[in-house]
């Protein structure tokens, strides 16, 4: 049966069906195109999101072992050397601390002795307010090497003490 054999109504019906089907296909394609456009509007962000970034890079085990051996050969001795220096400095500081505490104790004992001596003499002639008499300064000068005192400082101490005594005498005369 050919198309000529079919009645005219049926032919138009088939043609209508085809056009309807074609229209529906066009609608579906338009909707698909619209959905695709909406989806692809954000494509720049999506490409950025979906792109892979290399965060970690794999290196061969030989390179890793080589880096470890270089570290142990170069860095570890330097660290040990610095650690030894710090330990030596710590020991020096501890000895210095004990030396200074012993000196402080000795000075405190001397101060107490001078205060006792001052109370006995009741402000005697050779005793000043610092607790050092002429004899004490002479003893310091003779034992300066043993105690580590500076000679110039001791002479300056004697000079200043004498100057103070003269000034006190002058003030007493004026009053």
Curated annotation (Swiss-Prot):
Residues 70-122 form a coiled coil. GO terms for biological process: attachment of spindle microtubules to kinetochore; cell division; filamentous growth; mitotic sister chromatid biorientation; mitotic spindle organization; protein transport along microtubule to mitotic spindle pole body. The keyword Coiled coil applies. Disruption phenotype: Cell cycle arrest in mitosis either with unseparated DNA or with unequally segregated chromosomes. Abnormal spindle morphology. Inviable. The keyword Cell cycle applies. InterPro entries: DASH_Spc19 (IPR013251). Keywords: Cell cycle, Cell division, Centromere, Chromosome, Chromosome partition, Coiled coil, Cytoplasm, Cytoskeleton, Kinetochore, Microtubule, Mitosis, Nucleus. GO terms for cellular component: cytoplasm; DASH complex; spindle microtubule. It is found in: Nucleus; Cytoplasm, Cytoskeleton, Spindle; Chromosome, Centromere, Kinetochore. Belongs to the DASH complex SPC19 family. Component of the DASH complex that connects microtubules with kinetochores and couples microtubule depolymerisation to chromosome movement; it is involved in retrieving kinetochores to the spindle poles before their re-orientation on the spindle in early mitosis and allows microtubule depolymerization to pull chromosomes apart and resist detachment during anaphase. Component of the DASH complex consisting of ASK1, DAD1, DAD2, DAD3, DAD4, DAM1, DUO1, HSK3, SPC19 and SPC34, with a stoichiometry of one copy of each subunit per complex. Multiple DASH complexes oligomerize to form a ring that encircles spindle microtubules and organizes the rod-like NDC80 complexes of the outer kinetochore. DASH complex oligomerization strengthens microtubule attachments. On cytoplasmic microtubules, DASH complexes appear to form patches instead of rings. This is DASH complex subunit SPC19. The gene is SPC19.
